[in-house]
Amino acid sequence: GSHIGILYTDYFPRESKRGGAWMNSYRKQSMKNDEMITPVIFNVGNFSKPTGDKPSLLSYDEALTLFHEFGHALHGLLSNVKYESLSGTAVSRDFVELPSQIMENWASHPEVMKQYAKHYETGESIPDELIEKIKASENFNQGFATVEFLAAAFLDMDWHTLNSVDNIKVNEFETTSLNK
């Protein structure tokens, strides 16, 4: 293999750290005088810490987040562009989530789960019955999520069909739109 970049990780919470998970870069990939400048990428999370003599045991949601952010890291590490301004996640908003969504989707595939979701003491893979329950739970509260997407779409349509935005009061406009 060859050097493609450096990945730093900071996965556990601490008092001075903001919540959530994200990827960023100290240096983006680019070309300078026909020489590849390799990226320096970092992934940050706030995953469950190890306790006592037990390792960090991630929840399913934390595993999805880890895969998601690693997708962003791969996007940054595997860039091969001339200009830093086009490197990694410095792409159009509609594309920036593609690598991370692919990784997140893979994380929920049963055959992939069997590779990483193992009992920390026995090494036994996650049982098929538990995978089925996890998959079934993904449909829970789907009606609410659909209503949220529709509300955002209707609000967008109202904004984009305005003839003028002069003197518009944003909060009033959005309240009226969402109360239709």
Whereabouts are the PLM-identified features?
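Cation-handling catalytic/transport regions enriched in His/Asp/Glu
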Residues: G1-K180
